[in-house]
Amino acid sequence: MRIKTTNSEARELVKARVPFKASNTDGEYVGNTYVVYSYLWYPIFVYKDGQWFENKDKYSPTTSRQTSQLRPLGEDIIKVNTQELRDLI
């Protein structure tokens, strides 16, 4: 079950790796990997094997804002490009 929330309040859910649905963003598990999507197809964060990864590619001002709102603060995050992020999923 996914928790309904807003983008501005979803950061703690992302950090705790809880499935959620917000304004054009979603957090869900794909197998054992936690993925945060923008518009259900563009991955912005992936948590795999104890490590956070962030998409370093710029897509749109909206996606950049979502990334800022959802970034799990205080975590070590490796920035990779979109294809590398998709390969992790």
Short names for language-model regions:
Residues M1-I89:
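Terminal leader/tail segments of proteins
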